[in-house]
UniProtKB/Swiss-Prot annotation:
Homodimer. Heterodimer with AKR7A1. The active site is at residue 85. The record marks 113 as: Lowers pKa of active site Tyr. The lineage of its organism: Eukaryota, Metazoa, Chordata, Craniata, Vertebrata. This is Aflatoxin B1 aldehyde reductase member 2. Keywords: Acetylation, Cytoplasm, Golgi apparatus, Lipid metabolism, Mitochondrion, NADP, Oxidoreductase, Phosphoprotein, Transit peptide. Residues 1-46 form a transit peptide. With 4-nitrobenzaldehyde as substrate, it exhibits a substantially greater specific activity with NADPH than with NADH. Conversely, it has a 1.8-fold higher activity towards succinic semialdehyde with NADH than with NADPH. InterPro entries: AKR_Detox_Biosynth, NADP_OxRdtase_dom, NADP_OxRdtase_dom_sf.
Amino acid sequence: MLRAVSRAVSRAAVRCAWRSGPSVARPLAMSRSPAPRAVSGAPLRPGTVLGTMEMGRRMDASASAATVRAFLERGLNELDTAFMYCDGQSESILGSLGLGLGSGDCTVKIATKANPWDGKSLKPDSVRSQLETSLKRLQCPRVDLFYLHAPDHGTPIVETLQACQQLHQEGKFVELGLSNYASWEVAEIYTLCKSNGWILPTVYQGMYNATTRQVETELLPCLRYFGLRFYAYNPLAGGLLTGKYRYEDKDGKQPEGRFFGNSWSETYRNRFWKEHHFEAIALVEKALKTTYGTSAPSMTSAALRWMYHHSQLQGTRGDAVILGMSSLEQLEQNLAATEEGPLEPAVVEAFNQAWNVVAHECPNYFR
């Protein structure tokens, strides 16, 4: 079964490549995901990246392959994983799909990350070990985008960056990315890389959604100044912005998900599971009903439309939203929402009011 699904995924990738035109040898610069075209002079919307954190956990290999196929068949082509996702199963599943990741003529782009957790570090040996292990799992010679997943405050950053430069020179990754770093750390890293002639970071992956906007104050201006594009994770606040939860649910038995039943559950509950967040969601839900009546979009749709049309993401700068999922149905619903138009002004204002309700306890974007 998996073999058949894998072949289907590979065929989808070929069709995607065909739509993109003949294959050509690429220089050492990453091809970005095709962003949605502007309609009638509207601003270019942010791109969409497939987040694969649940592959190997809530999604088995067959279900994972089906979601990748559905994603590619929409003409999208960037996949995001990490060394640590599901103890490496996410990378292994992606590597088993026969996509030809990392080859010169592959139009499907892959990103992974090295982290400083669970006995790992960002010391040179650990960075190399993590990346080379990821390449083996992904069955590819190089990744298109290699992130430092979070700061390692016990390792001098210059050592980490030197290691990244060496790995880049060896052809093991194309672009360097940062995630969960403070804005001052981004400035320090960029300056160090530039002064030493090392590969410059070009992408930052950070937490951003309609009720988690801390990045707007300092980080986004920093990224604009240094020319990094921004990829937003947690666009639905781990699922809280779907509106399917109630604050009292934390005290009862819940099905497995971001907030319950896994090693990251406590982190996500500490991040988003707060009374003010539920009050903020109620404000938006009321505005949706008042504004749209019986044709009101779902809370999920509204939250994603806010990201694509009303946030500070800019498609012209190559910004993107990372869409995760725990099923094919969920992915298809989320992708449909990304193609919908802007929200009515009253709902946008309700989202602003919601942000004001939770701003005082917004989780930090850095670690």
